């Protein structure tokens, strides 16, 4: 963005030169050749040109011989102050003939919107006043603040000392009192005020909010308070009746757009507004557009565009909000949070699929169909959510498939919605093949009854403690019955280490025939017993696996035991079994 455009313009020629068009502007002043945003400002214009001037006094009502408001040839209306003709017009605005003091007349120019002022000038058609005050408003005329004063007697008119030659003594700009305009040889005079004269040297507009506020105005007012007199400045009776006359009121400035626009336009209602760029909006480009709030709004400078950034929502949201805490945590890079993510997405950036959907790896994240429904089977799946990456639904025991829609190998469909797939049954031993008859069962085993507490001493006496799931009915193998099992967890193992995975549980045939232990397919059990079996071809046809013989304990599994067994396992590893 160009540096601060100071210019103290003292003659009509220099005023015209400042407002004349310069070299051709680039195609898009708000972006460089590569399309990157950069700070930009509208050109310097006469903000008062063609604007209505509100004068507190104008001659012609009632009509006189020299001034008649109803006759265009003899009218001296305030419109002559800002007409496009400027100094070329032979007519001047003229106040009424003021018969007595105070001889105050005000000229107010509403600019239509906020401008950043550079200068104010006014040409007088008669001897210039000896006392003039310049005021500005930032709220369209509701309140006023002084810009500067011009007087031949600053202390008398405004109670101020004359302006020092090197500008304000303080750190910021202030309204100073300058010498009154001098009369020209032709009897006219020129009031020329530069905003630079009221500001300390070296103050940069880009980095000084105080200076930005100082030069901002929506209205400018010129107050003519005392005509020029040859004698005592307090003796107004010597000049009455008196009439002020002036023309060519100029307010040089730039449309205030905070560095985010290179021009101002009229909206549909005829109001002057900035043609905002960089994702900004508003009459002065003073805020970010609704979806451009990934970082807070800032005024553009010559070094940094501070463009408002669109929220990163991957095309799945139309609204977002700014979160300062997230912005700080990101190193002041991003603070946007997407709202109402569409297309089954979720997250701050709509970057993952919502519950019940998963990412389609064959589509881009910005694709409207990037998230596919899990479509988990209502009976075979244990829930409606699936893995966000693979789409795999959580299946019930014995169920398989991406959507849990079929039974796993070795399982068959049941009529139960709780357990839709059960283990395919394997024929067990018959009475003819069993060496023990039911009436002999009491001599073989007594099933465990009631509650059972697992103490450290009992835990340490067993060669192994494992959780198993029975896969099918037992199969007779000589003096033994073999049950296919899956070892789900190992809490203690013997010399030949028990391992998780598929295995076999060997039960003496006599005990198995009496239902001791009673092992049902699809159920889980806690097995506390002897060590791992011998190699294949062992006694009585027993193969490798686990043994549930006399001295072993088989209990229906309870989930509450897991924590207790893990605690006993840790105590064993610390050597507590030796003490027990």
UniProtKB/Swiss-Prot annotation:
This is Netrin-3. Residues 441-577 form the NTR domain. Netrins control guidance of CNS commissural axons and peripheral motor axons. It holds the Pfam family NTR. Residues 1-27 form the signal peptide. Glycans are attached at residues 104, 387. Residues 36-254 form the Laminin N-terminal domain. Residues 255-308, 311-371, 374-421 form the Laminin EGF-like domain. One of its GO terms (molecular function) is RNA polymerase II cis-regulatory region sequence-specific DNA binding. Spinal cord. InterPro entries: Laminin/Netrin_ECM, Laminin_N, LE_dom, LMN_ATRN_NET-like_EGF, Netrin_domain, Netrin_module_non-TIMP, TIMP-like_OB-fold. Residues 62-83 are annotated as: Disordered. Disulfide bonds join 92-125, 255-264, 257-274, 276-285, 288-308, 311-320, 313-338, 341-350, 353-371, 374-386, 376-393, 395-404, 407-421, 441-514, 460-577. GO terms for cellular component: extracellular region; Golgi apparatus.
């Amino acid at each position: 963005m160009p540096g601060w455009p100071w210019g103290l313009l003292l003659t009509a020629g220099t005023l015209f030169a400042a407002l004349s068009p310069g070299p051709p502007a680039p195609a898009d002043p708000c972006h460089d050749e590569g399309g990157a945003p950069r700070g930009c400002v509208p050109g310097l214009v006469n903000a008062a040109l063609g604007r209505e001037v509100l004068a507190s006094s104008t001659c012609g009502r009632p009509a006189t011989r020299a001034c008649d408001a109803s006759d265009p040839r003899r009218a001296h209306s305030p419109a002559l102050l800002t007409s496009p003709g400027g100094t070329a017009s032979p007519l001047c605005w003229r106040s009424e003939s003021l018969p007595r003091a105070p001889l105050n007349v005000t000229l107010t120019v509403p600019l239509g919107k906020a401008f950043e002022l550079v200068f104010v000038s006014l040409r007088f058609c008669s001897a210039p006043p000896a006392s003039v005050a310049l005021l500005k408003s930032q709220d369209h005329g509701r309140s006023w603040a002084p810009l500067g004063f011009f007087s031949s007697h600053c202390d008398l008119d405004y109670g101020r000392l004359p302006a020092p030659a090197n500008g304000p003594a303080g750190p910021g700009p202030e309204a100073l009192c300058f010498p009154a305009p001098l009369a020209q040889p032709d009897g006219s005079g020129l009031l020329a005020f530069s905003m630079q004269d009221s500001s300390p040297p070296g103050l940069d507009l880009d980095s000084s909010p105080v200076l930005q506020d100082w030069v901002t105005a929506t209205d400018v007012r010129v107050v003519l308070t005392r005509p020029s007199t040859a004698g005592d400045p307090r003796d107004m009776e010597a000049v009455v009746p008196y009439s002020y006359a002036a023309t060519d009121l100029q307010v040089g400035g730039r449309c205030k757009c905070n560095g985010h626009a290179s021009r101002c336009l009229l909206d549909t209602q005829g109001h002057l507004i900035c043609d905002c760029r960089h994702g900004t909006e508003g009459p002065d480009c003073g805020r970010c557009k609704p979806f451009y709030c990934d970082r807070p709004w800032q005024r553009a400078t010559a070094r940094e565009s501070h463009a408002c950034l669109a929220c990163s929502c991957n095309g799945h949201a139309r609204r977002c909000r700014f979160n300062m805490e997230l912005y700080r945590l990101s190193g002041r890079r991003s603070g946007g949070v997407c709202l109402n993510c569409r297309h089954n997405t979720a997250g701050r950036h709509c970057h993952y699929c919502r519950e019940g959907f998963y990412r389609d790896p064959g589509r881009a994240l910005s694709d409207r169909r990037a998230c596919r429904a899990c479509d988990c089977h209502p009976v075979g799946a244990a829930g409606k959510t699936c893995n966000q990456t693979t789409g795999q639904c959580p299946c019930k025991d014995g169920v398989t498939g991406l959507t849990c829609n079929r039974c796993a190998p070795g399982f068959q469909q049941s009529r139960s919605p709780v357990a839709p797939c059960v283990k395919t049954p394997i024929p067990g031993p018959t009475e003819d093949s069993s060496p023990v008859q039911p009436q002999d069962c009491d001599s073989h085993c007594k099933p465990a009854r009631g509650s059972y507490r697992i103490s450290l001493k009992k835990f340490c006496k067993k060669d192994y403690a494992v959780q198993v799931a029975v896969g099918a009915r037992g199969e007779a193998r000589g003096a033994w019955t073999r049950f296919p099992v899956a070892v789900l967890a190992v809490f203690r193992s013997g010399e030949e280490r028990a391992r998780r995975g598929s295995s076999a549980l060997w039960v003496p045939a006599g005990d198995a025939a009496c239902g001791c232990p009673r092992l049902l397919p699809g159920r889980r059990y806690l097995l506390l017993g002897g060590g791992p079996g011998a190699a294949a071809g062992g006694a009585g046809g027993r193969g490798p696996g686990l043994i549930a013989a006399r001295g072993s304990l088989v209990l229906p599994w309870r989930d509450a035991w897991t924590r207790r067994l893990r605690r006993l396992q840790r105590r064993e590893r610390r050597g507590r079994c030796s003490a027990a």
